[in-house]
Structure formats: structure tokens, C-alpha cells
């Protein structure tokens, strides 16, 4: 299916604050966002280098700093395939970094997974220290995406690595706390929905429902096969499963909610969930209301196939209105931002759907994105990895401060009206009682 061209409603509200050039190119699995929650990004290049990006106070100004991190046991002739980071689930402490690479061994490359984690008290979050503490695992398959997911094991939560391979399968690596190392365990023990695959998984997304033991897992394969599963973690039962076959490899699948409400552990979101599916040959689509309609209610992202293949996507709130936008980045050097317009927009029903808000051009193909607060000011930056390096895009501080002031005025006005209402009610009480 071919999508129609779309016209952007306005200009991109983000400006480029910095650009860091790579010594060699990265790939779609080469960015790990927000390491340790400390506003640091990790970007891996094919030639075995890992760069850490952060902002720091230099001469009373916040400036971007890029530093090469020396991760142990990555040979000079290695080609890095994927990188991921996570914080251990409480009460455990520490940052874990995983890096897959292929070592040049003459006729045939040898694939490895290195897992870095420092158990020394005081060093659990120190990247320089973590980079020296390595578990080196030789793989029997070619690795693709390395990601992580939090899963319920007995009464506690555990974060595990999930690695897709060309065997084709998903491999699970879980920490053995007693031995202070990670071990591969059968994926079906914790993720029964990730078995029986006939094509390599190019992207996997696991979304836990807050306040419940349920989750949605979505995967997209090289063959165009897409699977979404609704699972109860306690019983390990697959409650519902849907699949569809699209044309061409699937570059990204993301489970998300279009609601403006915030998910909290105390108040699970009573909203419909959607899944974004980005294909390398077709327009990106969103399947809405998964739990009720499966993969039946499909909405196109208009014009998303007009700039060569979609290589990566992100669902996040860019315009700061509390509702998510869908960002689509292409090999054709374009970043596209879409917004869902539903009944609340006042548009006729025929015009409900995703509309192109803005687009931005870059000078080389786009590979990966992350939306994280690098400066520590509460506003998230958009990191965009292109073939040439990392672009950091920021909000206009003038526009952001105007938005904050407008919302503060609104809050003050609401509070004033509430207090006025209480005073009016209290004043009317005695008079009403006397009259009766």
C-alpha cells in the first residue's frame, strides 16, 4: 500500500543545540538513552567505539561533552551491533550495560555479548568503573536488537536482557545474584509469548501495565510478521495474541497509549492501548484499541513512506501538552512528527486520525532517537543519531518559560475559584439553616 503525501501544519519547534561527529557510522541499535537516569546517552559506532554524551557545567555555562568510554574486552577489530542499559529493579542497586559485537575471526565473524556491571559499593553507577567489570559471553547466533524488560519473578521485580538473533529466537539473560553474573535462561519461563518464531525479530517492545501483573509484548520481524501478545505475568498465561503479515521488514514496533492521563502504580490507566508499526517498505501505521480490536483498527501515518525507508520511531510528548506525538525518522534524512486528532479536536469524523505537525530535514540518513533530559532542567532533549553523528535538539527556552507561566496562571486561577466556591458555600450555610 502506498501512502499519500502530507503537508506539515507548522515548523519544527526544536532547534539544534549541538552536533557530535562519529569517527565511524552507527546503526539502528546503536543508541542507549538515559544511562542510570543521570542524563547521559551512550552511542556505539561500528568500529568498536562507545561515546558517552552529557551536559556539564563549564565556566558557569552548561555545555555538551562527548567522551569515549573504554569498555573492556571489545577487540579493536570488533564491529558493535547493539547496545542497551538499564537500572536494576529495587531493592537492587546498579547500572547494567550490555554490548553485542562481532569479532573479525578471518573467514567467519565470532559474535559476543558483553555485560558490564560493578558490584563494588559506591561504584554501581560509575560508568568508568562499570566499563572495566565485564562478563564475556560467546554467542551461537548473529545478534540484532538488545533490549531489557522488567518482569515479575515470584514476589519481586527483576530486569532482564532480551536479545534477538538470526537463529531465529529471542534469548533471555538474567542476573544470578549469588554468582554476581548474568546467565542465559529459557525465554519461555518468563516470556512464553516470545517463542515459536520463524523469522528474525528486528524490534521488540515490552510494555507492563502499571498496578497490574499484565503486559503487552510486540515484535516485528524481517519477514514483515508482526505479533502482539497480552500476557499475565503471574500465571505466565498468554491471554490474547494477534498477528499480521506486512510487506517488507519491520523496523520498529512500539506499544503506547494516546491518553493524556499519567500512568501510576496506584492508578492503572483505564485506556485503550495502541501499537505503532513502522515498515521499511510501507507507510507507518498505528493499530488502535488493541485489547478490544486486536490488529483490526488501522490508522495510516500519511506521507511516512515518502522519504525512503522508516528506520526508527519514537512515541513521546514533544509539544508539552501531555499527549504523545509519534516521531518517524527516515533513511531519506527526514524527521516527521504526527499528532492524533480525535473527537476532542472538533474536526469532522472523516478527518480524525494522525496529522503531520511538522517535519525537519537533516544532512544524512537517520538511524535512532532518544528523548531524555540531558541538561537536568526538566525539559527533555531529543537526541537523533544520523550516519554522521549525534544531533541534540532542544526546546526554545523562551517558548517553554511562556508555557510554564501560562500553566501557573491557570493553576492559580483554578485555586482561586475553588477557594471562592468554598467561601460562598460556607457563607450560605447559616443563612439557609435559619430560613429553614
From Swiss-Prot:
The keyword Acetylation applies. GO terms for biological process: actin filament organization; cellular response to amino acid starvation; cellular response to glucose starvation; negative regulation of TORC1 signaling; protein localization to lysosome. Its main location: membrane. SUPFAM superfamilies: Integrin alpha N-terminal domain. GO terms for cellular component: glutamatergic synapse; KICSTOR complex; lamellipodium; lysosomal membrane; postsynaptic actin cytoskeleton; stereocilium. One of its GO terms (molecular function) is actin filament binding. Keywords: Acetylation, Actin-binding, Cell projection, Disease variant, Intellectual disability, Lysosome, Membrane. The modification N-acetylmethionine is found at residue 1. It is found in: Lysosome membrane; Cell projection, Lamellipodium; Cell projection, Stereocilium. It comes from the Eukaryota. It is linked to Intellectual developmental disorder, autosomal recessive 41: A disorder characterized by significantly below average general intellectual functioning associated with impairments in adaptive behavior and manifested during the developmental period. MRT41 most consistent features are global developmental delay, macrocephaly with frontal bossing, high levels of anxiety, and some features suggestive of a pervasive developmental disorder. Less common features include fifth finger clinodactyly, recurrent pneumonia, and hepatosplenomegaly. As part of the KICSTOR complex functions in the amino acid-sensing branch of the TORC1 signaling pathway. Recruits, in an amino acid-independent manner, the GATOR1 complex to the lysosomal membranes and allows its interaction with GATOR2 and the RAG GTPases. Functions upstream of the RAG GTPases and is required to negatively regulate mTORC1 signaling in absence of amino acids. In absence of the KICSTOR complex mTORC1 is constitutively localized to the lysosome and activated. The KICSTOR complex is also probably involved in the regulation of mTORC1 by glucose. Part of the KICSTOR complex composed of KPTN, ITFG2, KICS2 and SZT2. SZT2 probably serves as a link between the other three proteins in the KICSTOR complex and mediates the direct interaction with the GATOR1 complex. May associate with F-actin filaments. This is KICSTOR complex protein kaptin.
Amino acid at each position: 500500500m502506498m501512502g499519500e503525501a502530507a503537508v506539515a501544519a507548522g515548523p519544527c519547534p526544536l532547534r539544534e543545540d549541538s552536533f557530535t561527529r562519529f569517527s565511524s557510522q552507527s546503526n539502528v541499535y546503536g543508541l542507549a538513552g538515559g544511562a542510570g537516569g543521570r542524563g547521559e546517552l551512550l552511542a556505539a559506532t561500528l568500529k568498536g567505539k562507545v561515546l558517552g554524551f552529557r551536559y556539564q557545567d563549564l565556566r558557569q555555562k552548561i555545555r555538551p561533552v562527548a567522551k569515549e568510554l573504554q569498555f573492556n574486552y571489545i577487540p579493536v577489530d570488533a564491529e558493535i551491533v547493539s547496545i542497551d542499559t538499564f537500572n536494576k529493579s529495587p531493592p537492587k542497586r546498579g547500572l547494567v550495560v550490555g554490548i553485542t559485537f562481532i569479532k573479525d575471526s578471518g573467514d567467519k565473524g565470532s559474535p559476543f555479548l558483553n555485560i558490564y556491571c560493578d558490584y563494588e559499593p559506591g561504584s554501581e553507577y560509575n560508568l568508568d568503573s562499570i566499563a572495566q567489570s565485564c562478563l564475556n559471553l560467546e554467542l551461537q547466533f548473529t545478534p540484532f536488537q538488545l533490549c531489557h524488560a522488567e518482569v515479575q519473578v515470584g514476589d519481586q521485580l527483576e530486569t532482564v536482557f532480551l536479545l534477538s538473533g538470526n537463529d531465529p529466537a529471542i534469548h533471555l539473560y538474567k542476573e544470578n545474584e549469588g554468582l554476581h553474573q548474568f546467565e542465559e535462561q529459557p525465554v519461555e519461563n518468563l516470556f512464553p509469548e516470545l517463542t515459536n518464531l520463524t523469522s528474525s525479530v528486528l524490534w521488540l517492545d515490552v510494555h507492563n501495565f502499571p498496578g497490574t501483573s499484565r503486559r503487552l509484548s510486540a515484535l516485528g520481524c524481517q519477514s514483515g510478521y508482526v505479533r502482539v501478545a497480552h500476557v499475565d505475568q503471574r500465571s505466565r498465561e498468554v491471554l490474547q495474541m494477534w498477528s499480521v503479515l506486512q510487506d517488507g521488514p519491520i523496523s520498529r514496533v512500539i506499544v503506547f497509549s494516546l491518553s493524556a492521563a499519567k500512568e501510576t502504580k496506584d492508578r492503572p490507566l483505564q485506556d485503550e492501548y495502541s501499537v505503532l508499526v513502522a515498515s521499511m517498505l510501507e507507510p507507518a501505521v498505528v493499530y488502535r484499541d488493541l485489547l478490544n480490536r486486536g490488529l483490526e483498527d488501522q490508522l495510516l501515518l500519511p506521507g511516512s513512506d515518502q522519504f525512503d525507508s522508516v528506520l526508527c520511531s519514537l512515541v513521546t510528548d514533544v509539544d508539552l501538552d501531555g499527549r504523545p506525538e509519534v516521531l518517524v525518522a527516515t533513511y531519506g534524512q527526514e524527521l516527521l512528527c504526527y499528532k492524533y486528532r480525535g473527537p476532542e479536536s472538533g474536526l469532522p469524523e472523516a478527518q480524525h486520525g494522525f496529522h503531520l505537525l511538522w517535519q525537519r530535514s537533516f544532512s544524512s540518513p537517520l538511524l535512532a532517537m532518544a528523548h531524555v533530559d540531558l541538561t537536568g532542567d526538566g525539559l527533555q532533549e531529543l537526541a537523533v543519531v544520523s550516519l554522521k553523528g549525534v544531533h541534540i535538539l532542544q526546546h526554545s527556552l523562551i517558548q517553554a518559560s511562556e508555557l510554564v507561566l501560562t500553566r501557573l496562571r491557570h493553576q492559580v486561577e483554578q485555586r482561586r475559584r475553588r477557594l471562592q466556591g468554598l467561601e460562598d458555600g460556607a457563607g450560605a450555610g447559616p443563612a439557609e439553616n435559619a430560613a429553614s
